Structure formats: C-alpha cells, structure tokens
A protein has these predicted regions:
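Mobile-element integrase/transposase regions
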Residues: 42-113, 119, 132-135, 139, ...
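C-terminal domain-tail junction helix/linker
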Residues: 68, 75, 80, 179-181, ...
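RNase H-like DDE/DDD metal-dependent nuclease/strand-transfer catalytic core used by mobile genetic elements
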Residues: 26, 87-111, 115-234
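Short, polar/charged, Gly/Pro-enriched helix-capping and turn/loop motifs at alpha-helix termini
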Residues: 15, 30, 46, 147, ...
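Basic, flexible linker segments flanking DNA-binding modules
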Residues: 4-89, 161, 169-176, 249-259
Length: 271
C-alpha cells in the first residue's frame, strides 16, 4: 500500500484497493485508510509531501507523471534547479492583488521572500508602482537584514513595470544599484517560474486573506496591515514549514541558520 501510494499519491483509498486487487493483493478501502492513518498519509497533501521528500533524499527517480504532479502541487518544486545556499543570496519579490476595499479602492500586497529561509515580509498599498516596491524594501526588508548584520545580494522579480525599466531612470532599478543589489528577472510570460513566492501567495490566501475576508469588515488599509503583520509574525516564527530543505523548521530559525553559512569571500567582497 505504501509503495503504491508513493507511485500514485493522488489515488483515493478505493482506487488503491481496486488497483492492488488487479495485482492479486486483497485489501479493502478501509484497510488502505488504516495504513495511511498509521503513517500520517490520510491527505493527498501528505502523500505528495512524502513523494517529494523521498525524491529529495535521492531514494527514488521520478517518472514524468510524478514530476507533473509535484510541479502542480508545489511551485517550489519547479525551482529545484535553483540552489540557494545562505540567507540573502536570493530574495524573491512580487505584487499580489488582494482585492477592492469599499471607500479605498484596489489593494495590492508587495511580497518579499528570502528564498533560503522562506522568511517573508509584506506591505499593503493602494497602488502598484515602483515607489511602493522601493518602499517595502527600504522600510521593512533591508532594516531587518541590517539588524541581523546581513544584507540582500540578489533580487528576483517578474518583468512588471513596478520592478523593471531603464536602469538609468527606473526608481526600483536605481534603488537596487544604489544598494549594490543584483537584479534578476523571471522568464517572460512565465511568472510561475518564481515558484518560491507563488507558494507564499497560496498560503497567504488560504490561511489569512480568505479567512479574514469572511469574518472582518475592513475599513482601512492600516487595519488590514495590522492583521497581516500578526499573521506574518506567526508564519515566520511559529509555523513549521515542510517545503524543500525546511524539514519542519520555522523561517526565522532558518534565517538565522543561513546567516552562519554566508561565505567569507562574499562578505569580504561586499565590504
């Protein structure tokens, strides 16, 4: 049952029982569920996590179907060729449309994520402009790194106008140059290549915005920001993460761990 579930993690208990019966193995759907329950595999999510972890530990090779499943399940899995070795080496940024607030208008979230630790930051704005992209870095992200005697080395963004433009005129490009930060962009017409931050957006929707949207009538962006700050504090310091390389650690614990891994030559070069 466990071997089959590794091969076909999305199949339900009845389908598993039927497929095993064709192989001469008699087990009921309830028996399949019992095995899954004993191994914490009752949900499809848990079975896909097991597949990803088993592959990461290099104990199995994935077939084409398994690769497609994991890429659909985990945006981060699509970034498996991107190796990040320490805190600040690669920081992903994006703009996310949250919704419209009565009396205020459209609300956008500027999201920032350290790709090594998955530590996240977010600020809400009523516009989608280069100045807001600069503001979240200058007022929130860079001071956090500086407080930990660290820095951002490379920014990864899509090709949105709030991030990209003529290097000698665009406010965001100029700010990154001033701070000595390299700017990389995702492939054109393929924003999903920034899978690190896509996973964050999905989590924010499922665990915060949709829940708050059903229970609270917000009257201002500031009110929304207060609740978002509270959630992000929980996300970074209390919520165990099961993504690639995280192994149940919190982003903040990984952030601190990654500080010790910054190569001396990198620190020296920057200095």
């Amino acid at each position: 049952i466990l071997d089959y579930s590794l091969t076909r993690p999305t199949h339900g208990p009845l389908r598993v029982a039927q497929e095993l019966a064709l192989q001469g193995i008699n087990v009921s759907a309830g028996g399949v569920r019992g095995v899954w329950q004993r191994h914490d595999l009752l949900s499809k999510h848990d079975r896909l996590l097991r597949l990803e972890k088993t592959h990461r530990e290099q104990t199995i090779e994935l077939n084409d179907e398994q690769i497609r499943l994991l890429e659909r399940f985990s945006p981060e899995f699509r970034e498996r060729q991107i190796e990040v070795h320490y805190t600040g080496e690669l920081v992903a940024v994006d703009t996310f449309f949250v919704g419209a607030l009565k009396g205020v208008g459209k609300v956008y979230l500027q999201t920032v994520l350290d790709c090594y630790s998955r530590h996240a930051w977010g600020r809400l704005y009523t516009s989608k402009l280069p100045v807001t992209s600069v503001h979240v870095l200058n007022e929130t992200v860079l001071p956090f790194f500086e407080a930990h005697e660290a820095r951002v080395y490379t920014i990864l963004s899509d090709n949105g106008r709030e991030f990209c433009g003529r290097p000698d005129h665009h406010p965001y490009e100029l700010f990154l140059q001033l701070e000595g930060i390299e700017h990389r962009t995702t492939k054109v017409r393929r924003p999903q290549s920034n899978g690190f931050i896509e996973r964050l957006h999905r989590t924010l929707l499922d665990e915060h915005f949709r829940i708050k949207g059903r229970t609270i009538w917000y009257e201002s962006v500031e009110q929304m920001q207060t609740d978002l700050d509270s959630y992000l504090d929980h996300y970074n310091t209390q919520r165990p993460h099961q993504g690639r390389m995280m192994e149940g650690q919190t982003p903040y614990s990984m952030f601190k761990k990654g500080l010790k891994l910054i190569p001396k030559e990198v620190r020296t070069k920057v200095a």
